[in-house]
Amino acid sequence: RRAVSLWREDAHRWADTAGAEGAVVERLAVRVRGPLSLLAGLWLPGGERVLGDHGARRDVAESYLEGLQDALPRLRRATGAGRLGVVVDEPWAAAVLAGTLPTASGYRTVRSLPREEARGLWRAALDGLTALPDVARVWLAPGRRAASPGAELPGPAALATLTGESLPRPDAAADAPVPAPVSLVVGVGALDDGADGTPGTREAWEAAAGWADIGRGLTLAPEPGVRPVDVVRTWERLGVDPGRVG
């Protein structure tokens, strides 16, 4: 209840400030924690992570979707935004899938979440969000935050591929690719001529290029220090139209 109260206070303060400034909000982007990372960050009364309990995972996932479907329309009304864009942020996605998150004792790790269950959680969240008339676009942003130094996580390309399998497929009957309401966010590093960059960089670029080639929604997220011009040059070198990426 306290969290809901604070959230509503923030929304009203934002609306009051925009009203005082005479600002007209045509588009508003909202970042929400994704279902996998939410499960990783919640704890049961006994002290263990919700992630390790199948029944608790199911209950939280249902409440999560209900909460978003209630909160987002409220936010749009409070702010007067013409359209909402929602970023589903999954910083712990790779750690959840790799089973590297520690238990409460710290001596063991929570078992990895089955891939099919992860895909199901993402599909349910994305389907619920895109069904809302208040939401114009959704981005799914999987991350590779490690719970401990040296933890082995799925590579950027593998994570992008797994996440992408959860996204809605474009209409195969369409004459031309139409921007999907859901886009996959792929992190990319520097890729100079004749060099592969950091480990996994080339694979991430190739996964992104393949995604764009089949007309799927895609947004590139350059790593710190990577200039936008480098992203465009690499994209062109891979033979993909820069207009296909956000």
Predicted features by range, described:
Residues 8-18, 65, 69-76, 119-126, ...:
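Generic structural signal for well-ordered alpha-helices
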Residues 16, 20-23, 77-81, 127, ...:
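Secondary-structure boundary motif
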Residues 63, 67-203:
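Active-site loop segments of alpha/beta catalytic cores
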Residues 167-169, 175-246:
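Catalytic-face loop-and-helix region of soluble metabolic enzyme cores
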Residues 32, 88-90, 222:
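Short glycine-centered, acidic/aromatic-flanked micro-motifs in structured strand/loop junctions
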Residues 26-28, 82-85, 136, 243-245:
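Residue-level recognition of the N-termini of beta-strands and the immediately preceding loop/turn
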